[in-house]
Amino acid sequence: MGKEKTHVNVVVIGHVDSGKSTTTGHLIYKCGGIDKRTIEKFEKEAAELGKGSFKYAWVLDKLKAERERGITIDIALWKFETPKYHVTVIDAPGHRDFIKNMITGTSQADCGILIIAAGTGEFEAGISKDGQTREHALLAFTLGVRQLIVAINKMDSTKWSEQRFNEIIKEVSGFIKKIGFNPKSVPFVPISGWHGDNMLEESTNMPWYKGWNKETKAGAKSGKTLLDAIDAIDPPQRPSDKPLRLPLQDVYKIGGIGTVPVGRVETGVIKAGMVVTFAPANVTTEVKSVEMHHEQLVEGLPGDNVGFNVKNVSVKDIRRGNVCSDSKNDPAKEAGSFTAQVIVLNHPGQIGAGYAPVLDCHTAHIACKFAELLEKIDRRSGKKLEDAPKFVKSGDSAIVKMIPSKPMCVEAYTDYPPLGRFAVRDMRQTVAVGVIKAVEKVDKAGKVTKAAAKAGEK
């Protein structure tokens, strides 16, 4: 068996017709968690419906339809393996809610796979000024995705043309460079997601193709196929090295034990004996024990849903939406105000200063006022369009100063990603999403329990 493989999350980006469903379907199908029985069932259905030619995309459509109907699909279906990694596809291609999912999604993508259709006209449509591709790639970059793989798909439709491949590399390099990626660190792979060329095995149809290479801080790497390129992703730095952030989902009072906050560790580590601070409640106390699934844990790591017992704190002191942190290592604080880049998705009117919708950020659900619209920016290029706009409407992106109506704890996205992205809810729908750029933190004296004071003296 050997060592457990490292997990990486990829997000697949590309125009609706770039063939990303087929390509993703192919990888999941060939290297993934779909068992033989399910595949045979899907293939039979596809053939009966005369969709034989779409079998990979069809597999994906089936999965997607089931997911959207709320049938919980075995999440293994969205996974595949490379020699080095367990890969999870965190946003399935072609999703209407791509932007919302990317920003409010639970996981952070480690790498983007940009799928470009090589066919004449198709490539141009995908990358045109209003192109979705551009926007999704910029969004991935804004959300901290720094590794990218470009798969140039449907090479069969260009008769496997080297000239077309090089032409596209040139265009795409310029395009991703504008966003902020370094083309030298990006593998460009010519593929056919449908026929399987250069997906897992080297293609015999493109003898001119000598392979891809990339240079990153981790050194130079080269390979032939898309699978090679995914296997060559630089291993992500995991958030266990960061200071602790654990947003509370609930706080229970358990007879004979006391107060037990519950939540998911987003960054850092929590263990018994630690002195923790809850923000914005501003209460500091000692952790007596940590458990998961009713078993004692030595430590809770990022991704773990834990319950932990705290001394001398009543259920009234802390609540859902509070954030637990290490009192000695960048403790969490209340946010007096913060600036964020907000993308308006669907709002029927105009949004101006004074608008005060509810923000969902980690487990907090609190109204925040749009105090000032600082600038309007171009969603596709990230460039400033105007200073201090009066209003923003659907489709606009703006830098906004926001003030919470009640004490709230949030962080800059670059410091603690899960606490730095939010959804704006109004009229029972998500009207906008945002990424926090900077937070003005409030310093004030808080309550330190006897247990914490004692533990601090040790």
Curated annotation (Swiss-Prot):
> Where does the record locate the signal sequence feature?
none
For region G2, the annotated ranges are 70-74
One example GO MF annotation: GTP binding
GO CC annotations on file: cytoplasm
For region G1, the annotated ranges are 14-21
Q: Which residues bind GTP?
A: 14-21, 91-95, 153-156
Q: Identify the stretch(es) annotated as G4.
A: 153-156
Which InterPro entries does the record associate with it? EFTu-like_2 (IPR004161), G_TR_CS (IPR031157), GTP-eEF1A_C (IPR054696), P-loop_NTPase (IPR027417), T_Tr_GTP-bd_dom (IPR000795), TRAFAC_GTPase_members (IPR050100), Transl_B-barrel_sf (IPR009000), Transl_elong_EF1A/Init_IF2_C (IPR009001)
Domain of life, source organism: Eukaryota
Major place of localization? cytoplasm
List, alphabetically, the CDD domains matched: EF1_alpha, EF1_alpha_II, EF1_alpha_III
Give residues where N,N,N-trimethylglycine occurs: 2
Q: Which residues carry this modification: N6-methyllysine?
A: 3, 30, 316, 390
Membrane-spanning parts: none
Which residues does this entry mark as bearing N6,N6,N6-trimethyllysine?
79
G3: annotated segments: 91-94
Q: Where in the cell is it found?
A: Cytoplasm
* Keywords, ordered alphabetically: Cytoplasm, Elongation factor, GTP-binding, Methylation, Nucleotide-binding, Protein biosynthesis
Relate the protein's function as given in its record: This protein promotes the GTP-dependent binding of aminoacyl-tRNA to the A-site of ribosomes during protein biosynthesis.
Query: Cross-referenced NCBIfam families, in alphabetical order?
Result: EF-1_alpha, PRK12317.1
Q: What is this protein called?
A: Elongation factor 1-alpha
- In its UniProt entry, the species of origin is given as Absidia glauca
- Taxonomic classification, please? Eukaryota, Fungi, Fungi incertae sedis, Mucoromycota, Mucoromycotina
Q: Which gene encodes it?
A: TEF-1
